[in-house]
Amino acid sequence: MAYPFQLGLQDATSPIMEELLHFHDHTLMIVFLISSLVLYIISLMLTTKLTHTSTMDAQEVETVWTILPAIILILIALPSLRILYMMDEINNPSLTVKTMGHQWYWSYEYTDYEDLNFDSYMIPTQELKPGELRLLEVDNRVVLPMEMTIRMLISSEDVLHSWAVPSLGLKTDAIPGRLNQTTLMAMRPGLYYGQCSEICGSNHSFMPIVLEMVPLSYFEAWSALMV
């Protein structure tokens, strides 16, 4: 999860988030090189006395500054499109969980089980135990098996919401009357925190998400107790 004064993204826990981190570094390097070139040209203009006031056109220069930006945009677009297709591809999910946004809580339904569903509310600050996180803890965590492909179906009962867990690279809009889907896979166990990322009313800040990723054997024992 995030920590105070953090500058970068959260540590990647899923294959998708690892790809997003690589893409972030790739794009940042391109931006850094462009910025360095622009600063170098500006410094030359300020320090040199050589000018070309009589130059009316320069076909070679115009060709370069037309083709070069096009190449740079292609270098950014290709890996971006690859990740978009990866995020949209869901093949043979091992488990499907339906998520519904409400003002202001989340409800979850494990569709592969006959009667496994619950609501998830934020724990008020005055009820937190030592070591628990303010505005991020919930009364019912979403327990899921790690290292398995999980399909999340996301919608809303009232207004627009957004179901987001940054360390897993997840952010999907919850839209009334529409069912969006995304894929989830965690490579290691642990607690992963998120929040509603779409302003949805006065208590928008009080809609946390907590995923508890566990080994398959633990998940089977938990689901048996819940059902």
UniProtKB/Swiss-Prot annotation:
Annotated positions binding Mg(2+): E198
Catalytic activity: 4 Fe(II)-[cytochrome c] + O2 + 8 H(+)(in) = 4 Fe(III)-[cytochrome c] + 2 H2O + 4 H(+)(out)
Recorded topology in the membrane: Multi-pass membrane protein
Cofactor field: Cu cation
Main subcellular location: mitochondrion
Phosphotyrosine modifications at: Y218
Matches recorded under PROSITE patterns: COX2, COX2_CUA, COX2_TM
Residues passing through the membrane, by range: 15-45, 60-87
GO biological process per UniProt: ATP synthesis coupled electron transport
Free-text cofactor note: Binds a dinuclear copper A center per subunit.
The EC number(s) this enzyme carries: 7.1.1.9
Pfam families: COX2, COX2_TM
Role summary: Component of the cytochrome c oxidase, the last enzyme in the mitochondrial electron transport chain which drives oxidative phosphorylation. The respiratory chain contains 3 multisubunit complexes succinate dehydrogenase (complex II, CII), ubiquinol-cytochrome c oxidoreductase (cytochrome b-c1 complex, complex III, CIII) and cytochrome c oxidase (complex IV, CIV), that cooperate to transfer electrons derived from NADH and succinate to molecular oxygen, creating an electrochemical gradient over the inner membrane that drives transmembrane transport and the ATP synthase.
Subunit structure: Component of the cytochrome c oxidase (complex IV, CIV), a multisubunit enzyme composed of 14 subunits. The complex is composed of a catalytic core of 3 subunits MT-CO1, MT-CO2 and MT-CO3, encoded in the mitochondrial DNA, and 11 supernumerary subunits COX4I, COX5A, COX5B, COX6A, COX6B, COX6C, COX7A, COX7B, COX7C, COX8 and NDUFA4, which are encoded in the nuclear genome.
Family (UniProt): Belongs to the cytochrome c oxidase subunit 2 family.
Stated name of the protein: Cytochrome c oxidase subunit 2
Protein species of origin: Cuon alpinus
Gene field: MT-CO2
